[in-house]
Amino acid sequence: MAKKSLIQREKKRHKLEQKYHLIRRSLKKKIRSKVSPLSLSEKTKMQEKLQSLPRNSAPTRLHRRCFLTGRPRANYRDFGLSGHILREMVYACLLPGATRSSW
């Protein structure tokens, strides 16, 4: 089980990312716009605004975690579980439609 502080930190990052998502996306869109090209000084101002946003609001700072154990590795997106928890739940028939493979 992961430390509770790490899980809370990840939740905080997720909230920040949701809060600043639209602002970050619009700034990036304006910087990369080829329809109405900006001057170099305008682009640097936009870049400074983008850099002034909180670091933890960037989507690359997020990390998927198992919602039962908080384990950050070997997560399956479809289930939101880590590999060993997924395996245990499949063996206990707690996931409908998932079966053990046999050949």
Curated annotation (Swiss-Prot):
GO biological process terms held by the UniProt record: translation
PROSITE patterns for the chain: RIBOSOMAL_S14 (PS00527)
Protein name per UniProt: Small ribosomal subunit protein uS14c
Major localization listed first in the record, in broad terms: plastid
Keyword terms: Chloroplast, Plastid, Ribonucleoprotein, Ribosomal protein, RNA-binding, rRNA-binding
Originating species: Saccharum hybrid
GO molecular function, one term: rRNA binding
Subunit structure, as described in the record: Part of the 30S ribosomal subunit.
Annotated segments matching region Disordered: 34-56
SUPFAM superfamilies per record: Glucocorticoid receptor-like (DNA-binding domain)
Family that this chain belongs to: Belongs to the universal ribosomal protein uS14 family.
Compartment list: Plastid, Chloroplast
Domain of life: Eukaryota
GO annotation, cellular component aspect: chloroplast; small ribosomal subunit
Summary of the function given for this chain in its UniProt record: Binds 16S rRNA, required for the assembly of 30S particles.
